[in-house]
């Protein structure tokens, strides 16, 4: 198979994975501030919890291009900084340090110990670090354990030893922690199962007697080797360990968590056991046992032995576990355990990790859905919850005991302060432009159970509106100004109308003032605070300089008026209607002095711009002049060459706005002077203005909308930004992490004018006008450029479909092992409710009641927008499925036999068992749309032998994938009518696509099959299939011969039908040839060719061909299970493909992945990469040090700016 391709695609992530598989706490900056490092897919993200605002702020994110399996933090003795250990699929142990000054991770050590990839005998699955930072243990699922000693050398640098082996054949490791032993030799505890006897037993009896063992491995620092110090048999269901504080803080040892039991174990202590309480409630199964799935230990300040555990079950219930110790005569704990205590604490969503911060917050990395940030209200010590003691229960779990129960309740000890968006698991995705804006929106269904959501994703920045006030007239412009240079806040809002000017004072309230010195009878063109204590008002007939209550007026020459103006704190430039430029500069005494000569331009001046005066300088060196002859000229303002032309740039349309400003620049690493240009055609340009020569270079452009662009310099998060106003409002800024320039739309009203606004109540806001409204608003987050709006759903969504004409979506939802509403109601109404009271708990907090083998499923009608007045966005109708049916597939089908009327068709399965796959029967439900699609009317359902797993409209009929069968149905009065069928798939059809009379069938385990439908003979004939077995999850047709798809192992691929086979299948009368053609290797006679292949490290669940930006080319958009949204952008020219291929090769060697994985091997995890260039790697170029950028640019024979422009352009022209 050739690894080169004649098709090239550029793979980009537009939304990184949002699941968090591992989260750890540490002081990674070297200060006392705690931070959280989270692993999301291949990304490491550093978060800073802000206790004052109750928020979690992402500081930086780094793609390691590898599978992060585990994380651990450690701190060397005497140090104040935590280091991070990464266990990944690279077969290497990686130690990294966070450098706060550069806001990046730096790799300190990379030690190879085994093969790459996730393998059962290669360490990396488990990682534990000694609490005193002296050693770490990295283990595999089977057999291997390696211990590394961590130390310092004479230069106080971190060193790592050669690995010490602690292998044991025939053992499986279930859990691993480091014991807290103070400064004794480091000890690691492991839960292990010995399977060597089971392996040798042909009858299988030994499997019944397998024991789970708790082993202690001690690292002898003196002898430099590892020994197995102690072991003990524990409960056979044990699966998780938690470290118990030791030394002066506690008794040391571990908590061993098994099915419905938590046991304290240590080598020199007795065992103590408490059961995990079960839920009480009418809908709860009183015999169901729980397991601990996550937890955290927290030490309290101030007293020895003060610590507690918060342990969570699979229901989300948190239990507080504490250890009582024997006290000496003075009442101090001795370190000998007296008993174990457990009590119900609160219920929160099920988590992968819990982190308790010293500031009194709890970070919950949710298993599914949004991550949560809680504040502790209290520690649950004085509530009325029942507490259970180990003294009341036997140590041996096999001995009988009375189960204990509790009533779940709303949270009392924890208060939710922030929810962090996460789309894990993302089940389906559609693109549509329902809001009729320039760019379409992405609609997704994600989440699990009652925390599932329907989300609208929109490219833009969220805006926080502070004030929206209606004005007596329609203003054309607005400014704010201080009275003195050293004032902290703005004093006036100045509004310009067509016939006058209104001045408002800013204070506790905003009021009109008249004694300001401003001329109110004319419209205003510019307002500026000048010098130390002056104000300037530019109006069509002149300039007013107001200082200490004295007004100096400069009047424009007779029969001429001012048409454009530019100001800064020391300079004023105006353009007259005659095409002349008049320039003023402030004297040493604070008055404005006019330059003797006027500069005459060739056309009418449309816009002017002066940059800010650089610190330590007297003036801005350049004036930008835009004329109606479609040019921009740069004029010098230096005393020896005042108003001399330095450079000129031709434009495609007349400039409507100019703005010179200094902004952060990724190319130079510092700040650069830019000229921003807005054109009448709606195009925005950004060009570099050389501070020495005045030349204009490196022009980049973006189409913002059909209206002329206005530009304003604003400040957001202490960064200089450009506000660009067209048919939408846009903000241009340097990305906080990459420093690359980004132009992002604002999720706000269309504005006509904008300006900075600084007051006591709003320290960094903006003021704008649209129509008769004055609006004051602020932008809080610059990093997140995708806005999410959520609508809650009932159960886990499975598929999403859109109404063919209306702004309505339909979802099918199903949850396994969950009681359906009718069963819940029966249990609640039963007079003999055996398990407590009949309180109904909100399912989004407590989940739905469990029922083994039961399904809860429904069809929801979702209105994502509402009408803005009476109807709110939300679920407008829900149809619950009964009979233990679960919805699996859905399609909107237009039946030709019903005059093209569209129906919603839903495939269901009855009494399904997921693994091994079992069912009793399947059905196809048909619903008619009514009330403009807002209601569904049940027509009939058709019984089929297997649950339909894929449905599709096809030539005015329905095509269904039912097991291996492909079947065509038409709509009858009482049921669907079977028209044609064929067995086309080896195992199970999971996806269908069609063009013309060709159907593309995706098999669950055997890739794609191309099927031709012959209407003359009403036959379905497979004529081409795949070369390798792909476990298909989703597919879409790229063109008539090519199909893009994805599989369960995280691969994206494009397959193409051979040209000859494609033509043969379409020829009239070819069915005889196709049916009797010779099979090849138990498949069809033709094989599909692989055109492109790449590994994504997520499971793509949906893929579609779409357009994401105005005027952009079509891309392949895919959504992954972990919340990833990515695009594959086709290259238009071979030259671009070759350039990015070369760039990718250089970055592989110059910026190798942080965790040591080979990038090419990573992207070719299962099949070698073919025809796909990694855009996420190419975008790391902007974050490289300057010397590396220059070196790569030299190798590619290009400038740094040129490379960065190409990287930026390919993203902005096709995605966001």
UniProtKB/Swiss-Prot annotation:
One Pfam family hit: Beta-prop_RSE1_1st
Keyword Transport attached: no
GO CC terms in record: spliceosomal complex
Gene Ontology terms: biological process: mRNA processing; RNA splicing
GO molecular function, one term: nucleic acid binding
Keyword Nucleus: yes
Family matches, as InterPro entries: Beta-prop_RSE1/DDB1/CPSF1_1st, Cleavage/polyA-sp_fac_asu_C, RSE1/DDB1/CFT1/CPSF1, WD40/YVTN_repeat-like_dom_sf, WD40_repeat_dom_sf
Alphabetically ordered keywords of this record: mRNA processing, mRNA splicing, Nucleus, Spliceosome
Subcellular location: Nucleus
Role, per record: Involved in pre-mRNA splicing and cell cycle control.
Subunit structure: Associated with the spliceosome.
Family classification: Belongs to the RSE1 family.
Protein name (record): Pre-mRNA-splicing factor RSE1
Protein species of origin: Pyricularia oryzae (strain 70-15 / ATCC MYA-4617 / FGSC 8958) (Rice blast fungus)
Organism lineage string: Eukaryota, Fungi, Dikarya, Ascomycota, Pezizomycotina
Gene: RSE1
């Amino acid at each position: 198979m050739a690894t080169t391709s004649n098709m090239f695609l550029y793979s980009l992530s537009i939304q990184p994975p949002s699941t968090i598989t591992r989260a750890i706490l540490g002081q990674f900056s070297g200060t006392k501030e705690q931070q959280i490092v989270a692993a999301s897919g291949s990304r490491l993200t550093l978060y800073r919890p802000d206790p004052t605002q109750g928020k979690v702020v992402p500081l930086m994110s780094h793609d390691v291009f590898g599978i992060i399996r585990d994380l651990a933090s450690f701190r060397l003795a005497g140090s104040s900084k935590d280091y991070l250990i990464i266990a990944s699929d690279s077969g290497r142990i990686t130690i990294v340090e966070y450098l706060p000054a550069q806001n990046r991770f730096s790799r300190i050590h990379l030690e190879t110990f085994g093969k790459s990839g996730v393998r059962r005998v290669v360490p990396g699955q488990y990682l534990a670090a000694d609490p005193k930072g002296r050693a770490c243990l990295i283990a595999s699922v089977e057999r291997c354990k390696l211990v590394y000693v961590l130390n310092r050398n004479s230069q106080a640098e971190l060193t790592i030893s050669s690995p010490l082996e602690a292998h044991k054949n025939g053992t499986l490791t279930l859990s691993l922690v480091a014991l807290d032993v103070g400064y004794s030799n480091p000890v690691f505890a492991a839960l292990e199962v010995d399977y060597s006897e089971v392996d040798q037993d042909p009858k299988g009896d030994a499997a019944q007697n397998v024991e789970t063992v708790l082993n202690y491995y001690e690292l002898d620092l003196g002898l430099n080797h590892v020994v197995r110090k102690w072991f003990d048999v524990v409960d056979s269901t044990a699966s998780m360990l938690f470290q118990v504080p030791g030394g002066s803080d506690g008794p040391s040892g571990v908590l061993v968590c098994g099915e419905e039991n938590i046991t304290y174990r240590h080598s020199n202590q007795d065992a103590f056991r408490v059961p995990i309480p079960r839920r009480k409630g009418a809908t709860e199964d009183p015999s169901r046992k729980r397991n601990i799935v996550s937890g955290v230990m927290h030490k309290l300040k101030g007293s020895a032995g003060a610590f507690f555990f918060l342990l969570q079950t699979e229901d989300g219930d948190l239990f507080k576990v504490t250890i009582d110790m024997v006290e000496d005569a003075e009442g101090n704990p001795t370190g000998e355990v007296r008993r174990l205590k457990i009590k119900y604490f609160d219920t929160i969503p099920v988590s992968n990790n819990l982190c308790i911060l010293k500031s009194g917050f709890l970070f919950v990395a949710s298993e599914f859905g949004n991550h949560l940030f809680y504040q502790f209200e209290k520690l649950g010590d004085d509530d009325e919850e029942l507490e259970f003691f180990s003294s009341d229960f036997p140590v041996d779990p096999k001995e009988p005991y009375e189960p204990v129960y509790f009533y779940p309740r709303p949270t009392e000890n924890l208060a939710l302060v922030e929810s962090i968006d996460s789309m894990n698991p993302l089940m389906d995705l559609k693109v549509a432009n329902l809001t009729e804006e320039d760019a379409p929106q992405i609609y997704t269904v994600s989440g699990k159970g009652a925390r599932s959501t329907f989300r609208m994703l929109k490219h833009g920045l969220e805006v926080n509106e502070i004030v929206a006030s209606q004005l007596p007239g329609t203003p054309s412009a607005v400014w704010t100004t201080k009275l003195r240079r050293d004032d902290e806040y703005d004093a006036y809002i100045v509004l310009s109308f067509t016939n006058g000017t209104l001045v408002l004072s800013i204070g506790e309230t905003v009021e009109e003032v008249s004694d300001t010195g401003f001329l109110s009878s004319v419209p205003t063109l510019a307002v500026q605070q000048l010098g130390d204590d002056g104000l300037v008002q530019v109006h069509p007939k002149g300039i007013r300089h107001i200082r200490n209550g004295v007004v100096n007026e400069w009047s424009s020459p007779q029969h001429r008026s001012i048409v454009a103006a530019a100001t800064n704190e020391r300079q004023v430039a105006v353009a007259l209607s005659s095409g002349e430029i008049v320039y003023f500069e402030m004297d040493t005494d604070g008055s404005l002095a006019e330059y003797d000569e006027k500069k005459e331009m060739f056309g009418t001046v449309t816009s002017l711009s002066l940059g800010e005066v650089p610190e330590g300088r007297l003036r801005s060196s350049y004036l930008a002049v835009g004329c109606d002859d479609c040019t921009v000229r740069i004029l010098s303002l230096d005393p020896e060459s005042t108003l001399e032309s330095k450079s000129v740039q031709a434009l495609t349309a007349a400039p409507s706005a100019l703005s010179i400003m200094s902004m952060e620049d990724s190319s130079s690493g510092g700040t650069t002077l830019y000229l921003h240009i807005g054109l009448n055609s709606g195009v925005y340009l950004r060009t570099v203005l050389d501070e020495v020569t005045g030349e204009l270079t490196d022009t980049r452009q973006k189409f913002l909308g059909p209206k002329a662009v206005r530009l304003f310099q604003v400040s957001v998060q202490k960064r200089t930004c450009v506000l660009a106003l067209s048919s939408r409002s846009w903000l241009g800024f340097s990305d906080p992490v990459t420093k690359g320039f980004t132009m992002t739309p604002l999720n706000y009203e269309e504005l006509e004018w904008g300006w900075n606004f600084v007051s006591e109540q709003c320290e960094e806001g903006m003021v704008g006008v649209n129509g008769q409204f004055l609006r004051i608003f602020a932008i809080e987050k610059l990093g997140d450029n995708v806005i999410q709006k959520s609508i809650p759903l009932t159960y886990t969504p499975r598929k999403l479909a859109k109404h063919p004409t209306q702004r309505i979506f339909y979802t099918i939802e199903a949850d396994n092992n969950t009681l359906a509403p009718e069963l819940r109601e029966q249990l609640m109404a039963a007079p003999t409710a055996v398990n407590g009271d009949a309180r109904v708990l909100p399912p989004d907090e407590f989940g739905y009641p469990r029922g083994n083998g039961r399904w809860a499923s429904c069809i929801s009608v979702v209105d994502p927008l509402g009408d803005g007045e009476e109807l709110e966005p939300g679920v407008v109708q829900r149809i619950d499925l009964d009979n233990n049916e679960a919805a699996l597939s859905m399609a909107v089908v237009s039946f030709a036999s019903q005059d093209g009327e569209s129906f919603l068709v839903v495939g269901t399965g009855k009494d399904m068992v997921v693994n091994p796959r079992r069912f009793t029967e399947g059905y196809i439900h048909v619903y008619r749309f009514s009330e403009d699609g807002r209601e569904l009317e049940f027509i009939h359902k058709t019984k089929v032998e297997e649950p339909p797993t894929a449905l599709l409209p096809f030539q005015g009929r329905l095509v269904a994938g039912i097991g291996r069968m492909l079947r065509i149905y038409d709509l009858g009065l009482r049921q669907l009518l079977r028209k044609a069928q064929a067995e086309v798939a080896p195992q199970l059809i999971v996806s269908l696509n069609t063009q013309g009379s060709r159907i593309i069938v995706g098999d669950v385990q055997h890739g794609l099959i191309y099927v031709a439908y012959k209407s003359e003979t009403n036959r379905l004939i497979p004529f081409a299939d795949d070369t390798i077995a792909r476990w298909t999850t989703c597919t879409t047709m790229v063109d008539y011969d090519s199909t893009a798809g994805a599989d369960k192992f995280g691969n994206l691929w494009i397959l193409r039908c051979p040209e000859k086979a494609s033509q043969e299948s379409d020829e009239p009368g070819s069915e005889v040839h196709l049916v009797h053609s010779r099979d090849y290797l138990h498949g069809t006679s033709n094989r599909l060719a692989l055109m492109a292949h790449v590994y994504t490290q997520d499971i793509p669940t949906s893929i579609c061909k779409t357009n994401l930006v105005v005027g952009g080319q079509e891309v392949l958009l895919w959504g992954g299970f972990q919340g990833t949204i990515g695009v594959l952008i086709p290259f238009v020219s071979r030259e671009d493909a070759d350039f990015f291929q070369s760039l990718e090769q250089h970055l592989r060697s110059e910026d190798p992945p942080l965790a040591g994985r080979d990038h090419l091997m990573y992207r070719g995890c299962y099949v070698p990469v073919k025809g796909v260039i990694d855009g996420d790697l190419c975008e790391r170029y902007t974050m490289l040090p300057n010397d590396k950028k220059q070196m790569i640019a030299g190798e590619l024979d290009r400038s740094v700016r040129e490379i960065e422009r190409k990287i930026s352009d390919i993203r902005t022209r096709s995605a966001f």
